[in-house]
Amino acid sequence: MPKTKLASSVELSFEEPELFVHMYDFAVEITDEFCQIAFPGAFHPAFLLVKLYHILLSVISMGSIIYFFLNYSNLLAFHFNIKILFFFQFCSCFLQSATLAISQTHHLVLALIANGPCDVILAPALFALFNLPLIFSMLCMEFSQVLMVIERTLASCLFVCYEKTTKTIGFVLTSFAVIVPGLTCLYMYYDDKFNYPQMSAMATSPSSKLRINYIFITINVLNVLTLMHSIGLYRHNKQKINMVKGRDHFILSSRFQMNENVSSSKLLWRLSCAQLIIFLLYGCAMYSLRIFLPGERSAVWQAVTEFCYTPPLYCAIMPLICIVCAQNSLKQRNSKVQSLITLRSVGQEGWDNYQGMLQKQWE
């Protein structure tokens, strides 16, 4: 609730919106009555708790990403082309988390020190400064996932010569991972002046709402296709490596790459599954709120809307999935090394093992 004011401060609070209007050219007239109707949740405890939740989640996400880079990034022995896309998605998640943490901290402090309902309105430039990185980083997370699946498809189909190729494919795909989200943001906001009063960086400008809906529908379709393709890619690589498992004369580099294709495609379908669930949950939540909570936006409606902003969940889950995959990869590697160490090399048993290896080599 807004703080209680004396008569003199009440008079001042009615002047503040007037000063704000003269300072910024908003699309609508800013009055206390408008702010109380448009932003009923500005001082609601549930709304403030959601902001605190996003701050904590973002801090945890950034900490998890840093922890992964320091302790587990070297355990994923991937080709440069997939690794650069993989790290680009981590950077996108870090940008999403950092922007969300800063913006929500600003909104929380602003709500706590505000004297009136119009004090929580963001300046147009500040809203754009917070909103654009959130949208851009979210699109980068999505398109980098699609491009990683494309890269693994090329690696699986061209596994004989892919190791000999240069890093050009990785740089080209990473450039697309930046350019496509940038052009998408340009399409979404090319005529948006960011002059509609907003109290949250996650709000949608009325002039861009329809185009944003189209983009999110496209993202959900891409998530479904990416998940299906990544699962098929994993099964294909698994079958391929099973076919050559007993062939010791198979080229070592090709066998290593096939093992890499299996581990990377397995990680990709797990990430794609998490991304699909989280982004689909976000879209379903938004449409459900519009259906089941129609009419004027109450304080609870605004709190639930912010709570349903689920992309930060992916930023928190992605490092955990990668850490688990890296640990499993390390265990499998140690298990294979241990099995070779325990193989007898002396006596009759050692001679039998040696003959068996020679026989497999010449088959």
From Swiss-Prot:
GO annotation terms (biological process): sensory perception of chemical stimulus
Q: Where are the transmembrane segments?
A: 46-66, 75-95, 120-140, 169-189, 214-234, 273-293, 304-324
Q: Does the keyword S-adenosyl-L-methionine apply?
A: no
Does Transcription count among this protein's keywords? Answer: no
Family annotation (InterPro entries):
7TM_GPCR_serpentine_rcpt_Srab, 7TM_GPCR_serpentine_rcpt_Srb
**Which Pfam families does this UniProt record tie to the protein?**
7TM_GPCR_Srab
Q: In this UniProt entry, which cysteines form S-S bonds? A: none
- Localized where? Membrane
GO cellular component terms attached to this protein's record: membrane
Coiled coil location: none
The main place the protein resides is membrane
Keywords, alphabetical: Membrane, Transmembrane, Transmembrane helix
Its Gene Ontology molecular function terms?
Answer: transmembrane signaling receptor activity
Bilayer topology: Multi-pass membrane protein
The record's family statement is: Belongs to the nematode receptor-like protein srb family.
- Its recorded name reads Serpentine receptor class beta-17
